[in-house]
Curated annotation (Swiss-Prot):
GO terms for biological process: isoleucine biosynthetic process; L-valine biosynthetic process. Pathway: Amino-acid biosynthesis; L-isoleucine biosynthesis; L-isoleucine from 2-oxobutanoate: step 2/4; Amino-acid biosynthesis; L-valine biosynthesis; L-valine from pyruvate: step 2/4. GO terms for cellular component: cytosol. It comes from Rhodococcus jostii (strain RHA1). The lineage of its organism: Bacteria, Bacillati, Actinomycetota, Actinomycetes, Mycobacteriales. This is Ketol-acid reductoisomerase (NADP(+)).
Length: 337
């Protein structure tokens, strides 16, 4: 089914310019949204808890900062860009008591709405504007007069103005310059979670670690294994990002292409596909979200345990040593402190 696309001419910037926008959170997306909206002539305030390290940064960039409750009371459009696991609490304690008839509640990701962790009053417009790129790219493209494609969705529309408002907001951050795709909270949430778990984060990570283990257990040097299964992954991903799988296969050697065709299906086979379907089913049923919420309620104990085990994998030790040799690699703070 063809998606519905919107561009600059389909959006009226004056709609969002006539509203007061509170952006809850000042991370990667919050920073990009708020600065770009401000530069588009929108009245913006940032909602951050007392003591947040981001307060000084936002104020240095000329933005007005208040608590989430204060800016929610002031605003008539509230964009929630805090971490997924913090949103329900912020909504209950700070946003919901300050909602008024005619307000709009927007999100950058649909998880909390789709799985009913947040239930907005019926008089509130509920929508989503989600750029398909990290915040620094959204901001850089906006400043350069370009844009990053974005998604919009409307879950609740008591006044029939949700889509026009979402498009106006998307235009304010540069999304309509590139193109905006209309979707649903269900589709955005489930596809996003599946991509993260089965391919981008979970699947890729386990493929890399297992490849490393196979090579080291076969007697190859850990350094050689690291280069072949992790370091060179960026070269392949960049080619796919720029021109798809066909561009990647065109760009690598015939040996690599031929070997990939023969061996790829031996690694990712019909059984893998069935397990991926099971992962999707867990997402669709809400099972993953229930486990996510339980982890938060238990003090993140499951997540911290998984993080610790992952950090102790031998590929991390080898990788840190090799990255010391790579002056061109941006080192994370945890490795340079």
């Amino acid at each position: 089914m063809a998606v519905e696309m919107f561009y600059d001419d389909d959006a009226d910037l004056s709609i969002i310019q006539g509203r007061k926008v509170a952006v809850i959170g000042y991370g990667s997306q919050g920073h990009a949204h708020s600065l770009s909206l401000r530069d588009s002539g929108v009245d913006v305030r940032i909602g951050l808890k007392e003591g947040s390290k981001s307060r000084a940064k936002a104020e240095e960039q000329g933005l007005t900062v208040g608590t989430p409750a204060e800016v929610s009371e002031w605003a008539d459009v509230i964009m929630v860009l805090a971490p997924d696991t913090a949103q329900a609490s912020i909504f209950t304690n700070d946003i919901e008591p300050n909602l008024k008839d005619g307000d709009a509640l927007f999100f950058g990701h649909g998880l909390n709405i789709h799985f009913d962790l947040i239930k907005a009053p019926e008089f509130v417009t509920v929508g989503m504007v989600a750029p398909k790129g990290p915040g620094h790219l959204v901001r850089r493209q906006f400043v350069d007069g370009k844009g990053v494609p974005a998604l919009i969705a409307i879950d609740q529309d008591p006044k029939g103005e949700g889509q026009a408002l979402a498009l106006s907001y998307a235009k304010g951050i540069g999304g309509t310059r590139a193109g905006v795709i209309k979707t649903t909270f269900k589709e955005e949430t489930e596809t996003d979670l599946f991509g993260e778990q089965a391919v981008l984060c979970g699947g890729t990570e386990e493929l890399v670690k297992t490849g490393f283990e196979v090579m080291v257990e076969a007697g190859y040097a850990p350094e050689m294994a690291y280069f072949e299964v992790l370091h060179e992954l960026k070269l392949i991903v960049d080619l796919m990002y720029e021109g798809g799988i066909a561009r990647m296969n065109y760009s690598v050697s015939d040996t690599a292409e031929f070997g990939g065709y023969l061996s790829g299906p031996r690694v990712i086979d019909a059984g893998t596909k069935e397990r991926m379907k099971a992962i999707l089913a867990d997402i669709q049923s809400g099972e993953f979200t229930r486990r996510l919420v339980a982890n938060v309620e238990n003090g993140n104990t499951e997540l911290e345990g998984l993080r610790k085990a992952n950090a102790e994998h031998p590929i991390e030790v080898t990788g840190k040593k090799l990255r010391d040799l790579m002056s061109w690699v941006d080192r994370p703070i945890t490795e340079t402190a």
